[in-house]
Amino acid sequence: MTRKFATRWAVKSFGASRRLARFGAVVAIVLLAGRADTSAQTPVAPLAGVDAALLEDIVVGSRILADFGVLDGFGHVSARHPTNPNHFLMSRSLAPALVTADDIMEFDLDGNAVDARGRTVFLERFIHGEIYKARPDVMSVVHTHSPGVIPFSVSKVPLKAMFHNPSFLAAGVPVWDIRKDFGETNMLVGNSALGKSLAATLADKPVVLMRGHGDVAVGPTVKMAVFRAYYTDVNAKLQSQAIALGGEPNYLTAGEGEKADMTNFAVIDRIWNLWRMRILPTLAK
């Protein structure tokens, strides 16, 4: 072997060794990443005493409201625990469109997570806990930053029922102003005192607006609370359009609202099944 040939051979061998080492490092990283992914996807233990159908309702409700633009990266859907009325169910801090059944956690009414396991929770969980404390009849709470509703939360124009689907609004829609009792804040319901004040303004109504923030809709089921959150946004947009036409809109009376809302309860499954069909395929992605 000549000196020149030996030098070339040594250089090629060194290059091949470096490539092999890099390949080995890449393989090791991939294997480690695979182990990490497997650990991250470990199934969460089922919540005690909670039917899978209720978890699905929370998931479908979260995703359909995001799909309709009532929710975006913010907002949340909760349900009172079916066997422990002093607890409620709500997802970890996550964009509503991404919520799965495994993301749903259990909280007491003070907003303490029963089994956090390092998962981040929503700051505004106090909205839900304090309303469940104040309203034993409420089994579900939805908080949104509904674009249609915001103008009515900051103006003197009251939100009123325009047609039969949002007929529940005919009972009156109070507006909670955080600044009235708490001064200048970050506008978020980040503690029990704020949540209690909001719940007091909601009183016995199905919907309360939050000045410069959004709204809260409640109901005896997740389906009805989601229905109310959706149609509150629809009503707000239609009312803005009607006002823009000029003159005073012909709103539903309290009596019309009460009778029409009874029909909503009778047909809720019709629209819910449509929404469910629309959302369930996204859960496989």
Write out the residue ranges for each language-model feature.
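N-terminal secretory signal peptides that target proteins for export/translocation
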Residues: M1-R18
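Bacterial N-terminal signal peptides
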Residues: K12, A21-A33
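Intrinsically disordered, low-complexity regulatory segments enriched
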Residues: F14, G24, M277-L280
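Sec/Tat signal peptide C-region and signal peptidase I cleavage site
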Residues: R35-S39
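Glycine-rich flexible loops
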Residues: Q41-K285
